[in-house]
Every structure is written in C-alpha cells, then in structure tokens.
Amino acid sequence: MRLILLGPPGAGKGTQAASIVEKYHIPHISTGDIFRYNIKQGTELGKKAKSYMDQGLLVPDEVVVEIVEDRLKKEDCENGFLLDGFPRTVVQAEALDKALVDMNISLDKVINIQVDKERLIERAVGRRICRECGATFHVQYNPSTKGALCDQCGGELYQRDDDNEETVTRRIEVYLSETTPLVEYYSSQNKLVTIDGDKKINEVFANIVTSLGSDL
C-alpha cells in the first residue's frame, strides 16, 4: 500500500498514521525525520540540504524530491509506505509522480483528513501537555483527572505558546492555501479519499481502512 497522508494541524494525523503503518506493515516516512537523519549521518544529500538551511533558505524542490526518492528506494518500502509532510505543493507532487514512474511504482491513495476550522482551533487551544513526560491532554475532550497535573506522572500541565487562537488560525490558513491545489491535483487522478476527522479516533481509522478497500 503506497499512501500519502494529508491533514491540517490538529486533525489527528499522527494518531492515524501510527494505526495505518501498524495495520499495513509499512514505514511512516516523515520528511522532517528523513531530513534530520540525512543531516545527522552527513550524507551527500544531507550536506546539500544543510547548505541551504544554514543560509536560512528553503531547500529547493529538486533536493527534497531527491531525499524522498532515496528513502523510498530502501528495502523496507518494497511493500509500500506512508508519506507524511510531502508533497506540499503541486510542483512537488508532479516531481514525486515522475520519480515514482522512474521506480516503476505508483501511488495507491491519498488520504485527506478534513476537520472544520472552528473545531481545529478548539482542539489546539484546549490542548495541555505535561512538562515531565510529554503526555497530551485536552481540557474538554481528554482532561486529566488530576486537574492541572498529569494523570500519568503528576507533572505540571502547560499550554504551548503557539496554541493560541491567532497562531492556530494562521497555521490552518497557510496549510489550506498550500494544500487546496494539491487536493484538486490528486482528485483529478482519482486517488484522493476524503475522511471526516471530526469523529472518534477509532471511527476515523475504520473509515480510512474502508476507503482503502480493506477490512479492520
């Protein structure tokens, strides 16, 4: 199963990604992770990417595609993969399509998790994180039974500085402006499946599995 996962910040993408890779026995490929890996290992691609980042420049699409393509050629991707965080633009999507053709493979589906903007803001603004163990809670949907302390370790819960309405709204708007053309691109290829992310976690996953033509 060769998949791409799309979804705005706060849509629960990370949770669903973990379930998808476990069910289909495929690697979860996050562009952030493979960038960090290549830079840490000092690979040629890592050095190339770092040279742009050190200057405060965006890494060009061709370098990003090269790094992703290199990762997709690894042995653990033989039975598929879940791409997360790439592509972000139609130009990157076209470059990825070309790279996949060169590798004699193609995408199966692009999963687009949708949640209303108001609900995304509500989710982010109510999020609380433990300073000690990193556990995540929500004041409304998943509160700690210990109030301002973590259920798991008793650590202090705090709200991230960027989990405020203004910043979250801006993040969502940037995401939508980038991703709307991408959604249209994959829709025109009949590869897009849109999933309502405003349901219980297990319901969202069940809908993803059904959309991929599988059984739970």
Swiss-Prot record:
> Reaction catalysed by this chain?
AMP + ATP = 2 ADP
Q: Name one GO biological process term.
A: AMP salvage
Q: List the Gene Ontology MF annotations in alphabetical order.
A: adenylate kinase activity; ATP binding; zinc ion binding
Gene3D superfamilies named in the record: P-loop containing nucleotide triphosphate hydrolases
What Pfam families does its record include? ADK, ADK_lid
Q: Where is this region: NMP?
A: 30-59
* InterPro entries on file: Adenyl_kin_sub (IPR006259), Adenylat/UMP-CMP_kin (IPR000850), Adenylat_kinase_CS (IPR033690), Adenylate_kinase_lid-dom (IPR007862), P-loop_NTPase (IPR027417)
| Stretches for region LID | 126-163
Report the subcellular localization.
Cytoplasm
**Residues where Zn(2+) binds:** 130, 133, 150, 153
| The protein's enzyme class | transferase
Protein role: Catalyzes the reversible transfer of the terminal phosphate group between ATP and AMP. Plays an important role in cellular energy homeostasis and in adenine nucleotide metabolism.
Subunit description = Monomer.
User: Do you know which PANTHER family this protein is assigned to?
Assistant: NUCLEOTIDE KINASE
What is the protein name stated in its UniProt record? Adenylate kinase
Organism per entry: Alkaliphilus oremlandii (strain OhILAs)
Q: Which gene encodes it?
A: adk
